Structure formats: structure tokens, C-alpha cells
Amino acid sequence: MADGVTQVDSTGLHSFSPSPSLSSSSSLPAVALSLAVSASAVTASYSISHLPPPPLPPVPTTMAGWIGWVFSFFFQVIPSVLYWIITFSTITLPTWLFTLFSMSLTFTMNFTTLLLIVLAVVSTISWFIRYRFLNMYSRLPPEPQRKEPQVDLFPDVQEGDSKPGLANYLDEFLSAIKVFGYLERPVFHELTRTMQTRKLIAGETLMLEEEKGFCLVVDGLVQIFVKSMRDGKSDTDEELHHLGAESSDEEHHIDGKQGYQLLTEVKNGASMSSLFSILSLFTEDIQLRENESSGSSSSSIALRAARVPNSIPTSPRGVMDSPSLGFQDHSDDTSNMITNGELPSVPPLHLGESRTPPSGDQHHQQHHESRKHSSRKRRKSVHPDIVARAMVDTTIAIIPASAFRRLTRVYPRATAHIVQVILTRLQRVTFATAHSYLGLSNEVLGIEKQMTKFTTYDLPNNMRGAALDRLKDKFIKERDRLGSEEVTKGIALHNPSAGRRRRSSSFLRKDAALQAKLMTPRRAATVVTPESAPAEHDTYGVSPGDLLSTIQSSRFGPRYEQPPAKLQTPLAEKENTHFRLPAMQARHTFRRQDTMDEDGLFRECILDCIMKGIGLTSSTRDALRKSNHSGEASPKLLSYDSRRQKAIFTNNAFGFIDPYEGSGDGETESLMSMSVTSAGGTSPVINLREELRNDIEIVYFPKGSVLVEQGERHPGLYYVIDGFLDVGVPIVDKGEDLVGVSKPAASKGSFPTLKRTTTANSVGAGGTAANDSRRRKQSRKSLYLIKPGGIQGYVGAVASYRSYTDVVAKTDVYVGFLPRASLERIAERYPIALLTLAKRLTSILPRLLLHIDFALEWVQVNAGQVIYRQGDESDAIYLVLNGRLRSVLESPGNKLAVVGEYGQGESVGELEVMTESTRPATLHAIRDTELAKFPRSLFNSLAQEHPGITIQVSKLIAQRMRDLVERPVTEKGVERSNAGSVQTATSTVNLRTVGILPVTAGVPVVEFGNRLLHALHQVGVTNGVTSLNQAAILNHLGRHAFSKMGKLKLSQYLADLEEKYGMVLYIADTNVSSPWTQTCITQADCILLVGLAESSPSIGEYERFLLGMKTTARKELVLLHAERYCPPGLTRRWLKNRVWINGGHHHIQMAFRLTAEPTHPETKRFGTVLKQRVQVLQAEIQKYTSRRIRQTPLYSAQSPFKGDFHRLARRLCGRAVGLVLGGGGARGIAHVGVIKALEEAGIPVDIIGGTSIGSFIGALYARDADVVPMYGRAKKFAGRMGSMWRFALDLTYPTVSYTTGHEFNRGIFKTFGDSQIEDFWLEFYCNTTNISKSRPEYHSSGYVWRYVRASMSLAGLIPPICDEGSMLLDGGYIDNLTVDHMKGLGADVIFAVDVGSIDDNTPQVYGDSLSGFWSVFNRWNPFSSCPNPPTLSEIQARLAYVSSIDNLERAKNIPGCLYMRPPIDGYGTLEFGKFDEIYQVGYAFGKQFLEKLKSEGSLPLPEETEEKKKLQRTLAPRRASI
């Protein structure tokens, strides 16, 4: 303290002032400063402690005082801290550094120490890089495989007894009359107002042939028996009356099976009447054939029309007994029969045989006295020898025959609709079952053959001679001009008025409709055409042999005579002149242009014969006129949109014959027809005849041309002018599908849409026909010939059936063709056409088909309803008519596994019925389904009388048992790894309806549906494909759209569409709460949930609605991408919360515009609008914030076959192409060359599966679906694997394997990164061997590198990979070529590439013992003749691949598998350095193999060959102007 002065200031604080000597000293400034600070601190503390305390400021008692005290404290402390920091950083720290650096240190160590230090540093760095930088693959977030979704099996709410009382009665009654289709309220009341009920006590019998009406069981159980054919027949009334009178004798008779056999048991809500008996009730007063003799004079027609009452039984008795007579004999026989007025007594028929009953002698005028007797006989002939017995006390309801007769008179259009519905179900239930399932082809085909006797009408005599020769000359000249190739398509005669009709058809139709509305009933019932000149017939002096006098006179007769004065009005006379003027002009034109009018007269004559053949004659029109005074309460007859017929007609040889384009709205058309009907008495006949005259086409087909193919919907009616048509059936060689109902009937590699256009020579080797003939090896069996004057396709075209036969031109044939659209217009305006067909069908029905029709039950089940449960007694076989069923196996532990799914045309339950065992699984309906129930009692009855049926069903069962036996071992378990494959295999087959549902509002489902529809058309769906949206449905329903009947009408319309088309797309383009969205969900076999990939993956409102409906249909997710790229992990985010997606997912590239508004915007609500806006904003923000590798796609599908919509279309219709790549180490590089050859050949790949190196190459191709990135990445990986340094650095102590597997993991991870299998553009899977559970596993989700690495893990070389506690090794140890699993995924054609090593099978003769020394010496001895024994490693390898070799041999024989093995045996497993060489070998082999397939015609691809280009040109054939 001597060097400074300390003083105290006025505040009581000490201050220190350094002395001048200390301040001037610069040697130790820091020391001086520190001393000064220390002295100051000591002095201050000493002074403060000894001096009296100064008066301190008062302690603050307020908040302001505390704040001031804190501020004063901080103003003193903070400056001192800052001062210390500054001094330390500027003075103290530099001083320390200067002292440290001025020091000198010396370290001494030897080289060993230095080396150890360096090794430690290097090891530390390498460990950090190896385990913290290069093994990023091990630090990925865990993403386990996605579990297979559980099977949805909701409780059956409809199980158990029905509701008691009145509700039970109504429910059972309504379920029974569903067979009539939708009924309007007046029609329903008309049917039920005279309904009667009847009580049957247990054991009471009922003679069904004596019951005059439609019978159904309301409560109880009734057994239906049939008289056995083996014990003789009982036809007389006395026997039947005695049988029905003595119930006790009858009971004993039936119980003892004395001559009767049980057909079926009828329970609550089922009908006791067959479909044919219902038709007979509607068609009592319908003629079988037109009375041609009465058509010679108009007066006779007028007289007969005046005498015809409301109900006349005028049906010939002996028409069915006459064989194929000459055409001139038909008129005489028929006229005599019709004059007699007796109805036919249809006898019991054996398999096509007929018995001739005696003809009646009553006269036509005595019909009133004989009506009851005739009706009773007719009813007996409709269902003879049928007896019903009540098992318990039963209540039945009977709708009497009088109700049906009155319904026919009061509501003829509704009657025709009911008849059409019954005819449709008759074909779907009875005919289809008998033909396809029971093998009763002769009985079914015999119906069409016998129908020709009713439809044969000859052309007039003067049109057969010189006129026909002139017609032939025109075609011969044109044929010579065109050449043989073009002629094979058929030549149509030029129709100059066809174009004018199409342009003005809508106007002409409305004009003629209004015209007919004002005409008298007499005039309206007359058909007038522009070519007919009524007044000038005698003026021109035409001879009686002229054409106009031979055309049906009834068309002109009423115009010659004076009508009754009370019916004639001046207005009608004025209106009639409107039609007479063109008639006079046409007559003069015939004088001037004989050739042109002769063609028109040919069309007139052909149309006359066709209309008489289908029952549209003058007498039927007159009879219809009396009762056709209603119609406002009847819906439109046709149950499908006629405008959609265009898509079908363009696919046949008559694509140029457009359907009626001017019809406009279908409902408007129906209303116009009904209003005209009620006003004028008939439909607008004049306009209809004019339209049909222009629709008639005269076509020439050369010998061998195919006019109609089996299974095709009839294009129309063919009237044979000259030549012969051969009707036959193709005979499939043995070894093919026996029945055709157990497998989808799709020919591989063919295009049915093109196949329908092969109207050329079917024997020729062109295009699809040649491929099909080679593939199926069919021969043909001729059934009967259609001669000139005959009509082909009557039943099929009028009733819209599919053809059971092929129709081939036996000779050069000239036919008149009337399109099916024209027939639909006829049936719509003249229901008598359908009634006539129904009458003819009931008259020629064989007894066997009648009994089958009685026993077959039409069953309708709701979505989710259980048909039978596992363990129930098997009482019936079920055939799917419409809808879809799923069979579910309930295993111990309440685990459910899908056994199979059954679509339209398939059957289930034969094995249990034949073996009388219990049901092996539970069967439930996926959606609303129509079934044909084939009871076991009917099967037993048929088996006793017709063993051929038993043989047919036994073949089906044997085929299914063979499939079960040959099912691979890998599919017999129900483990997680393969349960999904079984479900997928059955779910992708025979899909008939696909629902397209958006995830949320704003998804462009309409555009998506249109593109998918276009792709399905190009892929070629059997029988075509159509799409439905709300606009199409509203257009069809019209005024019934929002009524209860509209639902029934809609269900029938949708059922007809599913029968008509091979696939129907339901596009849900409405809001969530609309009924159409619900319909799309309930009608779908498969539901496609469409979402935008870049939008929010949250659950959408449509999905919530879908879940609320509890549908069990297959659900698939479709993600729409703006670019052909999927970021890693995107798909997993979508699938994570959607456990209900049980059908996989698809990535589709589709350019679209993001919009927040749906296609049909719903009601504007603030919450909904706000949510949509937020979603759009999220999507827009995600565009710029998401990490994406590239903003534009590097690889796009430039070839159409690689289009995403085509891939989805092939998956939906079961025509996917699979690629299976086998394992083999470096030999797998050949896979790259084979894939390139496939792309160059134009073969699309939809599913890829691989093993070992095949999984690596397959994953590369599935990622981008392009060869270019696959080639680059594969070559880079081969370079890494070919480096010996990497292999050497990865060596480890061989406790588990020789290497650690790190370098192998790195090579695979650098190739795939963090991508997941779900993100791949193509569907991909790889297989591994689970050595922990000793089973194969298939992986289709999770990290790619992980499961590809597991599939490539050779035992001993690389350690197994751990997955959920299990160890996975190379999948090739069990199955090196997974063709069977690929088949289970739904692939139709599979390319299997095998690159595995071939074992040395040289016989070994080294003896019973072996010395190792001798083995080594023998291996090095060049002169030894003994083969080298296998080494220990070779023996272990052969043991490991024993199972794989067995599966490989089985895979080669799987149908649809194309086995390929490139010549790569000379390359080793680890020779990755020979990449280019092995790649070229595979590429060359692939090109050679595919060229061979192409030359053989078995290349399954949509290739544009010259033959198919010719076929495509026939889609729009040219009209020959001759």
C-alpha cells in the first residue's frame, strides 16, 4: 500500500489512485493493475468494516422501489464483468499463449509405439466410417411386412326363422313373385286381387297339372314328385283323377317310391310352378304359326278379325309332330290345324323324342264350348305327371289363370316385359344349366331345330327365278372385282335409302307417330310402305303373278275395301294422303328404275317373311288392337339402353349397319310408343315398317364363312334367300376343359372382339382363327341345315340369348339380315313377338327339360348373406347366375382363410352332394347374387333315369379333385406367407363388375374410368365392356328414377348388362350420400379406390361410407401420379391406415388438373369447403417442400403395351403377363438380356417375381419398368461383386459364414436406397427360405434391399438375415422358379427364365467304401476312367436343393408357363466380371426364343400381325356399291 494513496470519498466508498512511479512503469502492467485492484478491494473492505455504517437507503417497500434497486445493482455488476472479459482476452490470454509457445518440449519413443498409435487412430476412424456412416441401411426405421388383411365375414342377420304373422306372409309372397321382375303397382294389384290361399294338411297331395294358376308356398314344406319313365307312363285323365282323389293310396304310392321320384322340396317363399308353366299362362291365346291360306284375300282377314274374340285358343295340334317337311307343305298343314281351333297337347318327351297325339275335331267357331277342355289339356301338356305332397301343414297361395289372361288383355306391355324377364331367366337358369353343366346339349339344341318349322316361309315364286339370278349376277361381278381376300368378309347389297333413314330417322319417327295417333284403328293396324300403291294396283294392270300381288295381301287388303263409315273421318282421309303420295311416286319409280326397285322389293319380301316368322302378322295385330288400350302404367319393355348396342354391332361383320340412332332418350321413346298406343290403337306401324325395310340387308357369304360363333350374342336374324347354312357345334378334344364352368372361358392370346369379325373362312390360317384352332384342336359336328326360306337365330335374337351353336355357310349363301336393334324395336312396339316365342317354346319343350325346370330354384341372396355354413348338410349344388360368392374356411383359433371365389357361370358344392358329406367351408355372397339351386333330389332322380348326366358331373368332380391333388405342397398350408396368394388367385378370376370409387372429392374418377374403359376395349374383354355413371342410369330410368319401382327396374337393368357384357364399370361420379354411390359399392365384385398420390393420405369421406356399408368385395387402391415416379415411403403412408385394402395397389400415371370441386358438387357447407381448401393447399405446399429425386420422369412408357391403364385392364380381366426370374449367381445377368428381348418383342410385363439374383434383376425392372436404368444399375452392382478386394476386406472368422455380409449389403443398398417394394411401379415379390420355421416365404412389402439381400443369401458365404426373429436364406433352396406362386397371383401367361446350375448326374461306381486319398489322386489322374466322386460341399449343396428341383419340374408343366433356359452353363456362380458376355448370351437367346414362339403363333401379346390388321379393317367393312 506504500505505492498508492487510498482515500475515502463523500459517499463512504474507498478509491485507489496509483502512484506516478507505478503508473509510469511499463514492465509489468498486468501485475500493477492486479495489485492495484487487490489493494483497493482490501482497503475498501477494511474501511467499510471499521467505519460506522453510512446511512443506507431505506429498504424499498413498493414495487417501484424494488425495480429501482435491481436496476442500480445491474448497472454496477455488468460493467465490472465486461471489464474483466476485455482484460482477459486482450492481456491475460495472449500472455499465456506467448509463454506456452516460447517453451520447447522433446518427446522420445520407438517405432513400435508410433505404429501402435497410428493403428489406433486409423482403426478409430475406420470404425466410425464403417459403423456410423456406411451402414445407414441398418439405421432405417423399422418397416415390417404388411400383414394380410383379415377376411370380412359379417354376421348373417337374415339367418333363422322369418318374422311371424302377416309380415312373414308378405315377405314369402314377395320373394316368390320376384321371378316376374319389377312390377308396377297396377300390375301387382291386377295379379294379386284374385289370389287364393289353400291349406294342405301333412301328407295331402296336389295334382299340379290340374291347378289352374301360379302356385307358391307361403308357409310349410312341399315335395314335388314326377312319374318315373322306367315304370311306364300314366297319361289318361282317369288315372290322374284317381291318383289325386285317393290321398291315402297316393301317400302309400309315393312313400314306397312306386313309380314316382322326388324332384325337389319347396320351402317358404319358393314357387311350385316352373318357368314354363308361367309362360303357358301368359300365352294361351297365341298362335304358333300364321295361317298363310287366309292371307290370300283381304275379305277373309276382315271376316276373321271380326270374329276373333278376346281369347281364342288357336294353336295347331300337330305342328310339332311334323318333321322337317318341304316348305310348300307347311302352309297346308298349318292352315288345316289352325282352322280346327284345337290347342296342342304336348306329350311327355324322351330326350328329343315326341309322341303324336290325336287331333281334335272341333271347329273354329265352337271355341267357346271347347275353351275349358282345351285349356285343361294344354295345362296337362305343360307339366304332366307332376304331383306335390305336403310334408307338414302347409299354406299355399294360388294366382289363378284368369288373372294372367286378364293381365294379358289389360296390360299387354307389362305382360310382354314379364315374359321377357322369364325368358331371360329361363335361358340363364334352365337352358344354361342343362347345356353347360349337365351336358344336355341335344335337348337344348333340339329346341332351335324344332323351331324352324314355325319360322320357315318361302319367298314368292316370281322372286326365285330370273329375279334371283339377277341378284346373284350383281354379287358375282362384285366378287370378281374385289378378289378372293376381300370377298371373305361378305358383300352387302347397296341400300341407297339407308343413309337418308339414319340422318332423318328421329324426325320421321315422331312425324309418323303423330300421324298414326290420328288414324282410325282400322288404318293404324295396316302396314303401308312407300312401295305399295293401293289405288293404282288395278290401274297399271299388274298380273296376278306379279310380285306385289304375292306379298302378304293383308298389308294392302283393308286399303282396297271401304272401311266402315263410323270409323272414317275426314281428318283421317286427309292424313292418309300424306302416305299415299310417296307410295304413288315409288310405283312410278319402279316403272322407271326396275333394278333399284327390285332390290327394294327383295327387302320387302324378306321383311314380310321375317315378320311372319316371328309372329308379327295381320291376325295378331288385329287381336292385339282390341286389348292394347292400356300402357301408361307399363314401363318400357326393353331393360337395356338400345344406344349401347352400337358397340356390339361394330364388332361383327355388319358394322356398317348402324342401329337406330335417332331414338333419342330411351324413356321418351317408350312414352311416345305408349301414348300412341293408347290413342290410336296400335304402335306407329307405318314408320316401323319403313324403318325395318331400310334395315334389311342382303348379304353374300362365300362357302365356309362363319356367320355366328358359339357363345356369341346373336347379331340378328338371317333369312336364307338361296344356299344352305350349316348349324353345328365345335367338339373339343379330350384333355381340355370338360364342362367349361369351372374355369374362365378365355382363350389365351386371342381377342374376342376381333374374333367376332372373322366372317371369313374359318378353316383358313389367318390370325386369331388359326391360333385358336391350333390351341383348341377342335373338330365340328353338324346338327342340321337351314334351307332357303328358313330363319337362323330366331330364339337367340328375339330373346337375346347367346348362341349355343356355330353357323357356317355350307355353300355360297345369300341371306337377308335384320339387325338385333331392329328386333328390339319390334319387341318394344309389338309384345306379341315375345309372346309368340314363349308359346312356341312351351309347345316343343322336352319332358326332361321340363322336369329340370321344375326342380331348379331361382334364389336371390343379399350382399353378405350366408348361403350355408361350414359343417351344414349338403342339400344342393349352387350355380352362380349373377353376382359373386366367396368360400371361407374357418380354422381352429377363429382364423378365416379364403378358399375360393365363384363368379358368373361357376358352380359350387358338387363334391359334397355326390359324397353326401357336410359342407367343408362357409359360403356367403359378396354382393347381391342370383343363384340356381340344383337340389340333390333332382340329381338323384336324373342319375337313375339318365346316367349320362351323372357321368358329366362326375367328370367335373374328377377334374376338381385332380386339381386339388396336383396343388403344390407350398399352397397346402394356411400360413401367412401363402394365404394371400390363395385369396388373390381366386379373386382375380372372372370379375364381372368393377366399381370405381374416389377416396375423397376432387379425384378425376370420370376421366380415369374413361381411360380404363378404352384400355379394356383394346385388351379385349370377352363379350365387351361398358361403363355406367349417374347420367346413364337416370337416362334409362327416366320418370322411375326416384320411385321404389325404379330400384327394381335398376336391378333388372344391371343384371341384363352383366349378362350382356363381359365386364361392367360402375363409376361413382356423385357425392357420398347419393344412392348411385351406394349402388356402385353394392354391385361391385372389385372396388378400385382411386386417390391422388401427392395429396393427403388421410381417410376420405368415400372410404368412411364404404366401411359403413360393410361390403365384402375385393378392394384395391389406385394411386394417380402426375409423373412416372413414386417417392420412397409414399405408398406405405397410404396403406398404413387402410387395413381393408385386400387386393393390392396400383400405380398409374395420369395427367390431371387438381381441382377442389367434385364432378357433381354436393351441397356447399362451410366445413366441407374449408376441408377441401386445406387439402388442396397441403398438396400445393407438398409439391415444393417434399424431397424428390427428380422433378421430371426420366423413363416413360413410350410403347402402348406398357401403358399403366393397359396393365390395370389386364389385371382386372385375368390376362396379366408374369415374369419369373430364377436364381443362379452371376448367370442371372442373362435376365437383363432376356428382359430387353421381351421389350423389343412388345410383350408387356405386369407382375415380376424372382429368386436370388432373379429377385435383384426383377426388382430393378419393377422399380422403373424400363430396361435402361435396370441395365446401368445391374452393371454397377456386378462391378462391385467382381472386386476381390471388397470380398477380402469383408472376410471374418467362419463361425456362421466366411464374410460379414457388409459389403454385400452395401452393394444392394447403394442400388435401391430406402425404397420399399410397395413403391415399385410394377407388382413385385421375392421368395426366401425361413430356416427358423422351415417354410418358404414370399415378400411383397417392406424395404427392397432387405428382402432382396435375404433372397440372395447363400448359406456359408453370407450370414442369414434376421426378420422378426426368423432367419432368412436364399429362396432357391425350396423353389428356385416360383411359377406356381405367380400363377396364384392371377398371371395368365408366365415367362419363366431358369439360370440355375445343372447337377452332374454321371453314374458313380466307386464302391461301398471310399478313401479320401484315392479320391484326391483320382481327381488329379488324367488317365483314370472312374468319374470323380462329389466333394463334401457338393453333397451339401445337392441336399439343400432337393426340394427346389422337384418344384422346378412341376413348374415346367403348369399351364400358361413358357419355360426359358439360356445357354449359360459354362459360367460360374461368382463370375460377375463377365457381365457383357453373359448379357449378350441372354439377349440372343431371348430374341431367338420369342421369334420361335411368333412363328408358331403362340406368342401371347397384342402384336400387329398382318392377319390381325386385316381383321381390324373388318371392324368397319365397306359397303359394296353394286
From Swiss-Prot:
Protein name: Lysophospholipase nte1
Motif GXGXXG mapped to chain: 1223-1228
Pfam families according to UniProt: cNMP_binding, NTE_Ploop, Patatin
Residue ranges of coiled coil: none
Region (Disordered): 1-24, 308-384, 523-544, 757-776, 1501-1522
EC class: hydrolase
Domain PNPLA: 1219-1383
Catalysis performed (reactions): a 1-acyl-sn-glycero-3-phosphocholine + H2O = sn-glycerol 3-phosphocholine + a fatty acid + H(+)
EC numbers for this chain: 3.1.1.5
Any one biological process term the GO annotation gives: regulation of phospholipid biosynthetic process
Active site residues according to the UniProt entry: S1252 (nucleophile), D1370 (proton acceptor)
PANTHER family for this protein: NEUROPATHY TARGET ESTERASE SWS, NEUROPATHY TARGET ESTERASE/SWISS CHEESE D.MELANOGASTER
GO cellular component, one term: endoplasmic reticulum
Motif (DGA/G): 1370-1372
GO molecular function, one term: lysophospholipase activity
Binding-site residues, a nucleoside 3',5'-cyclic phosphate 1: 680-800
